[in-house]
């Protein structure tokens, strides 16, 4: 469909509310989330998160948010997008209102610990998927584990 030569694209997802818009991550070099309207007359990659080439951690409005090596992205039944933010060692959520929030993990702190948002630790989470009951599974790469998450 389109060449993403400047992008290290790993994760992709469609939302029910935007069935023709493909969201995808750019890991390693640009640290961003992009979208591509598949019905557009001219296909154009549009950056939707902040910080081209700037790794960081910032929650809030999607267009001002910062990620650090976002790898996989997946949608739930409520049209939230979940992002495995590998470099920040966190799981992030993008709401239908385009707000970004850290739902589990401590930004910049790698480790292994189950627990609440303030105490759970990951080490380079890469893969993420969600089953039909909205259970979230994460490939916690640095800990060599697949983890099932409970997010309220």
Predicted features and spans:
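Conserved beta-propeller blade signature
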Residues: 21-24, 80-83, 135-138
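Residue-level detector of Asp-centered blade-edge/turn motifs that repeat once per structural unit
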Residues: 14-19, 75-78, 130-133
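Gly/Pro-rich loop segments of beta-rich domains
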Residues: 1-10, 42-71, 99-126, 152
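Preference for well-ordered, secondary-structure-rich cores of eukaryotic proteins
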Residues: 1-3, 10-11, 24-26, 31-32, ...
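A short loop-to-beta-strand structural motif that recurs across blades of beta-propeller domains
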Residues: 30-34, 89-93, 99, 144-148
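Short loop/turn segments immediately following the C-termini of beta-strands
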Residues: 27-28, 86-87, 141
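Blade-level signature of beta-propeller repeat domains, shared across WD40, Kelch, NHL, RCC1
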Residues: 124-152
């Amino acid at each position: 469909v389109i060449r993403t030569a400047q992008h290290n694209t790993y994760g992709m997802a469609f939302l029910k509310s935007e069935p023709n818009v493909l969201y995808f991550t750019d890991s390693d070099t640009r640290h961003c989330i992009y979208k591509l309207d598949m019905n557009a007359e001219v296909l154009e990659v549009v950056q939707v998160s902040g910080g081209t080439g700037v790794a960081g951690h910032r929650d809030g409005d999607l267009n001002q948010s910062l990620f650090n090596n976002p790898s996989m992205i997946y949608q739930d039944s409520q049209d939230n997008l979940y992002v495995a933010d590998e470099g920040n060692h966190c799981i992030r959520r993008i709401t239908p209102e385009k707000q970004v929030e850290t739902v589990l993990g401590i930004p910049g702190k790698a480790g292994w610990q189950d627990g609440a948002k303030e105490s759970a630790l990951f080490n380079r989470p890469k893969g993420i998927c969600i089953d039909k009951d909205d259970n979230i599974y994460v490939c916690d790469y640095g800990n060599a584990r697949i983890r099932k998450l409970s997010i309220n």
